[in-house]
């Protein structure tokens, strides 16, 4: 970037840009934010705005682009959405009073993880993550700058770090240490994260827990340092850090949550078709965020689960009160976001009016809960602090029809400030005085069309047409001449105008000052507002669970101290809702305390995967405090759920690979305990038949002998059903079918014992494969059944030569296949495997 012979303003731009090389610099110049040089060229393309140049006649004109300051947020949103950072440089003094170049400073750096003022309101959290490392220990901290939530945990390996980042759906990671090339490739390329670095620690430790492990402390303090460095202001809404461990909740990795469609449908990526979609009858943005959090982190503490269940039961028992409650919640705005706007100094009159409306709804919500007269609700009622003094202040101060822009006037309610009322009186009386002057001069001059108008340039003036110029009184003085008329003033009109303008200016300044004082006063209540937000959110989620329990015919599950599972006529609630009017066929799931594995056989499309997901979904719902879809349900409290479910039953899209199968299987057998739930669907199908069968059997035996976790294992390897005779904690079940007149009907019912035949050819028939192909498949099947595992003779070839292609021959010919053949995947970490695959893919 050339800096020779620059104007003072451009030199100022260059100096500031040097400090923020990784961000688009929006440089305030009057009513526009301007961008120059590479920023202008890139922004013009990304934002689809005009690219022009400064000093067009120079040898090297400077590329320039700009956006209006009043609509800048929508352009900032686009840049942030695409993963860029934006530095905002504001004018720090009035250009009219500036001596030399106007003083400018960067007042905020907006990044994907620090967005607080988006033009697209969203009820989702936007977490900014920080990770640091000390030896083999990782510290992971994260916060939401909008809600002020702040958490930290310690993790033992980088795979767990990546899993937690995926669960948080973070877009930006602040790094406190130098990544290895392998780690950077995973975070930046595979996970598509924006990476930022922070080596300094935040000195003010009042938000930190000094009992944290060193690496957790550094991750937290570096996150705070990064946030303060980019936001450049006091962030009084940030809550003290809360330490957690992933083992404190029902553990599920990202793949498990995706395969179960917990917060979004894996196929569409949308909310519809997920558990979140099913359970969301919340009425507030805060409640929606909390519900999503509960789904992500179900409980393992029976006492806390039962506490939630009891509130849901109270709401079910009080239908009319619950209806009043939901109506009252509709009047509640997003307190957490309003509190953050106060902290960031971005509150406008509309925000304060929304806050007052919300606070005025709290006594009604509290009264409804108190009216139910249930001790179970006491802890919720205690959180509903209406803060009446704050509601009274805002209601008394802010005019109901106040504009959104602070400087537009008309913000403060009449009667709140005596001096301001006097200024307003002058403005009102001035208008009357002007009307009186107009009438008086019209009568005295005899000019029937004489009237007083106003514009910013000439102020108030008498408008006289050319035909009436001969009747203009002598005390009129000319202010402007137009083609068909002239404009005049008088000393009296000028005096009144001066009084009015002075009153307006003083009124505007005083009104702004009063609003700033009110905003500062509101800032003193941030902690109480956040506590209130948490209370309202909890009430909202629990009433939502009650509504869903009622409309979806759910029942309260029971938890035993043993490992027995007994779900009578259970249903997959999401599938049932998606099916609508169609009849959903329930299934009973029973596993005695001494049964650890159900081996499930049956054809594709028969419902095996749905049956497996049904159990996992029921467990998640139960442990987050929801009622469940069944006639009755007795469950243990699981500490973790592990799944390996591919593209089955039209629930999850995408094709699995053998490598992913083995990695996910390894994750399960490495971390599962006897209190875990494991779901394996067709494990081993990604490799040769005997390899797959051998691996499947060995995994079953390992779980049976060394782990003892409750396991549903669906397989096409019918030979594995013989394990029931040798593994005492394994039982066979199958999906029932009805065969009649050569037609197979899937009954979608799980019954004891192994399946007697696959019905795979019937599935192929449903898929529309050619009739002659299906006939040939029937013939081959009959020969296989008669000859055991011996292959049938090939069909007679009509051509002279048939070429059989060997994969092993191809491996010798293609260098990438040769490299794959050399890999010892069983002695490699998942991270190493993924890294090798990425490198090989780049060579294709």
From Swiss-Prot:
Positions of ATP binding: 602-609
In terms of SUPFAM superfamilies, this protein maps to: DNA repair protein MutS, domain I, DNA repair protein MutS, domain II, DNA repair protein MutS, domain III, P-loop containing nucleoside triphosphate hydrolases
One GO cellular component this record assigns the protein to is: cytosol
Give a Pfam family name: MutS_II
Name a GO molecular-function annotation.
mismatched DNA binding
CDD domains in alphabetical order: ABC_MutS1
Q: Which UniProt keywords apply?
A: ATP-binding, DNA damage, DNA repair, DNA-binding, Nucleotide-binding
* PROSITE patterns named in the record: DNA_MISMATCH_REPAIR_2
Q: Which GO terms describe its biological process?
A: mismatch repair
Question: What is the similarity comment for this entry?
Answer: Belongs to the DNA mismatch repair MutS family.
**Reported function:** This protein is involved in the repair of mismatches in DNA. It is possible that it carries out the mismatch recognition step. This protein has a weak ATPase activity.
Q: What protein am I looking at? A: DNA mismatch repair protein MutS
